[in-house]
């Protein structure tokens, strides 16, 4: 029996999308993206977004649902994902939730209770003008508990926590909880030895360049302005600097590889803390068969 929801998770460059495409074909399933950057239109190469051909062969959802200048809250993502899951469950269609954004996945698998506070552009701009360091220190004063879960450089989550506090008068940490779904969930995680993952990260970064990533960054910067928050995210920030004459292409590649390795380590730590995940070695020649066995055992 196929689980109503199958999660494919893990660090970046572990082959989640590749496995998901094969599983979807075998199971006649749909794919829901759990990637906080693939939701944005035009940010394609740097987010390793499924190609148009892949999206045409297998139905994909929660990709290209926002303009680059828009903000999608975790609550909004959760609501859209839950609605799609309910729709496909009613149609008895298997659903694959695929990605490396741990909070997106947890919002679905654990049914996180999330404050329904709409984005506050003016308030966010005020905090942005004050700078990330100051904003984070302010958050530490009003909600020290949530600061334990937010990196000092994570501007998006810092601003979200601050706006929730200033709109509701209560820390976001006191408004969060869990309400787990009633349907069954199978979580499959992909992992491999660190040296193999390093090699995959290097290969992916070079592939991004070969696919035209420099041109993508240049086009986005000219269209939306170089201070667009998305251009300050992994990969885009390093190549933005190169496009603007700060450093060489080789340095942009090296910095992207380094920062991606660091990011992958944080992702791995997050997912490894979840005891519900069934881990598979992505180098196994029978990876697809192992995954299918887990699914049919549910």
UniProtKB/Swiss-Prot annotation:
Record-linked InterPro entries: Dimethylallyltransferase, IPT, P-loop_NTPase
Bilayer-crossing regions: none
Positions contributing to substrate binding: 12-17
EC number per UniProt: 2.5.1.75
Gene3D superfamilies for this protein: 1.10.20.140, P-loop containing nucleotide triphosphate hydrolases
Pfam families linked to this entry: IPPT
Region (Interaction with substrate tRNA): 35-38
Annotated site residue numbers, Interaction with substrate tRNA: 101
Enzyme class, first EC level, given as a word: transferase
Residues noted as binding ATP in the record, renumbered to the chain: 10-17
Keywords, in A-Z order: ATP-binding, Magnesium, Nucleotide-binding, Transferase, tRNA processing
GO molecular function: ATP binding; tRNA dimethylallyltransferase activity
GO BP term (any one): tRNA modification
Family statement: Belongs to the IPP transferase family.
Self-association state and partner proteins as the record states: Monomer.
Its job: Catalyzes the transfer of a dimethylallyl group onto the adenine at position 37 in tRNAs that read codons beginning with uridine, leading to the formation of N6-(dimethylallyl)adenosine (i(6)A).
Name this protein carries in UniProt: tRNA dimethylallyltransferase
């Amino acid at each position: 029996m196929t689980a109503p929801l199958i999660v494919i998770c893990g660090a970046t460059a572990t082959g989640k999308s590749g496995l998901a495409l094969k599983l979807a074909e075998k199971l006649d399933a749909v794919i829901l993206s759990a990637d906080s950057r693939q939701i944005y239109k035009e940010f394609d190469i740097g987010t390793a977004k499924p190609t148009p051909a892949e999206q045409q062969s297998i139905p994909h959802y929660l990709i290209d649902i926002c303009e680059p200048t828009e903000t999608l809250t975790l609550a909004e993502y959760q609501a859209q994902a839950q609605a799609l899951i309910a729709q496909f469950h009613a149609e008895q269609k298997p659903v694959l939730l695929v990605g490396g954004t741990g909070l997106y996945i947890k919002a679905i698998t654990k049914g996180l209770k999330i404050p329904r506070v709409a984005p506050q552009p003016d308030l966010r701009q005020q905090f942005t003008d004050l700078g990330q360091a100051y904003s984070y220190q302010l958050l530490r004063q009003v909600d020290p508990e949530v600061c334990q879960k937010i990196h000092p450089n994570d501007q998006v989550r810092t601003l979200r926590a601050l706006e929730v506090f200033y709109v509701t008068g209560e820390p976001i940490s006191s408004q969060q909880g869990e309400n787990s779904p009633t349907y069954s969930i199978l979580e499959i995680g992909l992992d491999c030895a660190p040296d193999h993952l390093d090699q995959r990260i290097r290969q992916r970064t070079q592939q991004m360049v070969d696919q035209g990533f420099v041109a993508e960054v240049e086009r986005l910067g000219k269209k939306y302005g170089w201070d667009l928050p998305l251009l300050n995210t992994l990969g885009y920030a390093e190549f933005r600097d190169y496009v603007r004459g700060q450093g060489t292409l080789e340095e942009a590649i090296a910095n992207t590889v380094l920062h991606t390795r660091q990011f992958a380590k944080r992702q791995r730590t997050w997912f490894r803390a979840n005891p519900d995940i069934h881990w598979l070695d992505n180098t196994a020649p029978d990876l697809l068969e192992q995954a299918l066995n887990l699914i049919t055992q549910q």
